[in-house]
């Protein structure tokens, strides 16, 4: 249809230009040629009429002849992707997709050339290995390139399969349990400092989201750069960690405008100035730290940067690879962990029975904070169930990650999809679907226990993929799971928690810009009785 549009419209543009140039009565008003005899307006009207006809024809084509015409969904989404993109810009995309799936079912056409799924089978069909696509379907290049701020090298997000596997090997090891064990003393020290900061509040309301964020950020920067920034004690770095959401939100807007001409300009105009300022603050700090770390010795650092320099994989990673990857990796590792812990504690504080059961499990297992280690926190069944349930009702990464169907086409959920179609699983809609889970909107950790009862037999556990599936599964999930368990155990062992009245509706309709835009979660922490 693009060729058709050109064939219809371009001749009229030429005629308008010619008519104006041939007119003997042309005046220039404000730099615009204007024919006094009305020729210019006449041809301009014809041009407008032609463009209108084109869109009428395109609408007819999209509804009646497009290869996706038989897929369910509202008609207006079949002719325009603007509603879809606006849902991202406005922070409403996860709820918007949820509502569509509730109305139209597990497969919905959400744009002229775009399909969203909440069917568990779609995880495997889209993201899982295929005979001719071992990394799953190709990533949507426009969407994922939006995460890159440096263009000197492709990051792990947009790299080709061979380079991707090489980078993934490094990052998976850098965020592995083995590395965390080597740095456990440092990690425990940061968490203990957070607990001490909470103790010093003397039971006054505190924003637990910011405490989690400062803790996670300090741990991740130690793992990545080989030094912790100790946000609680070094105010110099507080603007850096407080700017994380600015980078995330502005990136979300960029992903929504890449399909349009002048997309970057549109993103700049549609992003609040305060958010753009935060983005610049984040990039200033992180790029400064990257340059400083590159200039330092690798001896004894045992951080991700050292791993990148010393990898035996060929070809070796260059400084440009470090600059391309680390701005995103710092956020991906820290903010998803903060999101998981914030959602988990909010649901626990709104579920007294679950909170009581988890607190009893933690205090029954550990006698002092020193007993809580990386080696011991995984052996708590109800804690594991609470983490899993938090990831279901409040996924750390609720945003859809689009793939593009290969040119030869593919079968997704037993239906043929033509090549070039953008496809994805909508995580929030999938995890909250009654087709996939019993009482999907309730926080019920017991669904993940072996003795969960017959009610949960209907649960489709294969629908639950909080960190993705296949070769592109999140390499930082190990660190997210371990940090969450360490902090939750120390928090519940040391304090009795109370949700403040101002945060009773904290879980209500939070905006989503890649991750949840988390408001203050005010709690009171009373030291637990010895």
UniProtKB/Swiss-Prot annotation:
* Gene inactivation effect: Abolishes the formation of aculene A and accumulates a major product,asperculane A, along with two minor products, asperculane C and 14-prolyl asperculane C.
Give the residues the record marks as binding heme. 474
**MF terms in GO:** heme binding; iron ion binding; monooxygenase activity; oxidoreductase activity, acting on paired donors, with incorporation or reduction of molecular oxygen
Q: Which residues are glycosylated?
A: 2, 92
Which pathway, per its entry? Secondary metabolite biosynthesis
Q: What compartments host this protein?
A: Membrane
This protein is called Cytochrome P450 monooxygenase aneG
Organism per entry: Aspergillus aculeatus (strain ATCC 16872 / CBS 172.66 / WB 5094)
């Amino acid at each position: 249809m693009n060729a058709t549009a050109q064939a219809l419209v371009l001749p009229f543009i030429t005629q308008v230009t010619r008519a104006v140039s041939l007119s003997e009565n042309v005046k220039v008003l404000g730099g615009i040629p204007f024919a006094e005899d009305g020729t210019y307006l006449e041809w301009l009207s014809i041009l407008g009429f032609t463009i209108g006809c084109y869109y009428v024809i395109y609408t007819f084509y999209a509804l009646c002849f497009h290869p996706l015409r038989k897929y369910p969904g509202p008609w207006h989404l079949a002719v325009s992707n603007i509603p879809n993109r606006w849902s991202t810009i406005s922070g409403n995309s996860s709820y918007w997709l949820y509502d569509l799936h509730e109305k139209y079912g597990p497969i919905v056409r959400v744009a002229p050339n775009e399909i969203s799924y909440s069917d568990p089978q779609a995880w495997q069909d889209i993201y899982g290995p295929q005979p001719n696509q071992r990394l799953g379907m190709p990533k949507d290049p426009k969407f994922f390139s939006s995460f890159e701020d440096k263009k000197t090298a492709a990051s792990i997000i947009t790299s080709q399969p061979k380079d991707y596997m090489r980078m993934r090997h490094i990052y998976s090891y850098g965020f592995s349990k083995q590395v965390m064990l080597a740095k456990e003393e440092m990690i425990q020290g940061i968490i203990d400092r957070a607990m001490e900061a909470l103790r010093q509040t003397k039971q006054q309301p505190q924003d637990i989201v910011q405490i989690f964020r400062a803790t996670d950020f300090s741990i991740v920067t130690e793992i990545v750069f080989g030094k912790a920034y100790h946000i609680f004690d070094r105010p110099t770095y507080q603007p850096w960690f407080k700017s994380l959401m600015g980078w995330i939100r502005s990136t979300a807007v960029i992903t929504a405008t890449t399909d349009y001409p002048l997309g970057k300009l549109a993103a700049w105009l549609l992003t609040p100035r305060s958010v753009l300022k935060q983005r610049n603050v984040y990039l200033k700090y992180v790029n400064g730290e990257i340059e400083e770390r590159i200039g330092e010795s690798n001896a004894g650092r045992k951080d991700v940067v050292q791993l990148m320099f010393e990898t035996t994989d060929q070809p070796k990673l260059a400084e440009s690879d470090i600059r391309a990857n680390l701005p995103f990796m710092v956020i991906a590792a820290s903010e998803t962990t903060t999101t998981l812990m914030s959602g988990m504690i909010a649901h626990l504080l709104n579920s007294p029975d679950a909170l009581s059961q988890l607190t009893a499990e933690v205090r029954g297992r550990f006698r002092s904070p020193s007993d809580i280690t990386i080696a011991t926190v995984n052996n708590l069944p109800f804690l594991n169930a609470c983490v899993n349930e938090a990831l279901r009702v409040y996924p750390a990464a609720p945003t859809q990650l689009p793939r593009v169907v290969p040119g030869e086409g593919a079968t997704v959920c037993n239906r043929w999809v033509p090549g070039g179609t953008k496809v994805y699983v909508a995580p929030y809609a999938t995890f909250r679907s009654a087709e996939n889970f019993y009482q999907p909107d309730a926080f019920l950790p017991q669904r993940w226990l072996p003795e969960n009862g017959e009610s949960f037999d209907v649960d489709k556990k294969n629908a639950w993929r909080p960190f993705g599936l296949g070769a592109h599964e999140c390499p930082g999930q190990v660190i997210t799971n371990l940090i969450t368990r360490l902090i939750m155990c120390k928090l519940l062992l040391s304090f009795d928690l109370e949700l403040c009245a101002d945060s009773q509706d904290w879980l209500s309709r939070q905006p989503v810009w890649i991750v949840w835009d988390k408001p203050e979660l005010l709690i009171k922490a009373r030291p637990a009785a010895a």
